A protein has these predicted regions:
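An N-terminal, well-structured beta->alpha segment
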Residues: 2-106, 113
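Ferredoxin-reductase
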Residues: 4-6, 16-17, 87-159
């Protein structure tokens, strides 16, 4: 019989799965649920990644304590609300796994909020995003990268 804590966690995980656009991370959670792997689920849902001085970054995987497509979409939604309709944002990405997908998701979310974006089609170094903001007098810049973190991590910097 499931405890109240397990029931609440199961509901939270299911809610995450319902919004997760990535089958890989959704399946990761479904597998943990099917195995009743509460320690793994608790670790992924006991806290959320938070912004530090250099942006937000962490290990890639499922849940709010990992970098993934849903985490990126939530960050993009918050940024869109902050800068408002009609703003223009430049988005760059590095060559890490999922960086291009995260950048494209970011641009899509901004567009859904009537925020314009310029997105680099191939990987660029972080300073290129910073330069482009000033050169083109843009409102904001986003660089999808985990910077000096391990290659398995990802994240984004906001300028």
């Amino acid at each position: 019989m499931a405890t109240n804590e397990e029931t609440n966690l199961r509901l939270e995980v299911q809610e995450w799965i319902n919004h997760d656009p990535d089958p890989e991370t959704s399946n990761e959670l479904l597998e943990s649920l099917s195995k009743d792997d509460w320690p793994a689920l608790q670790e992924r849902f006991s806290q959320r990644l938070t912004f530090g001085t250099a942006g937000i970054r962490g290990t890639q995987g499922s849940g709010p304590n990992r970098m993934n497509r849903l985490t990126i979409r939530r960050v993009a939604s918050g940024i869109a609300e902050y800068i408002g309709q009609g703003a223009t944002v430049v988005i760059g990405h590095d060559a890490r796994k999922n960086s291009k997908v995260y950048a494209e998701d970011f641009a899509t979310l901004l567009s859904n909020h009537d925020v314009h974006s310029l997105i680099f089609s191939s990987p660029v170094p972080t300073p290129v995003v910073s330069f482009t903001i000033r050169e083109k007098s843009l409102d904001l810049g986003v660089m999808v990268t985990a910077s000096h973190n391990p290659a398995t991590d990802n994240g984004c910097k906001i300028f």
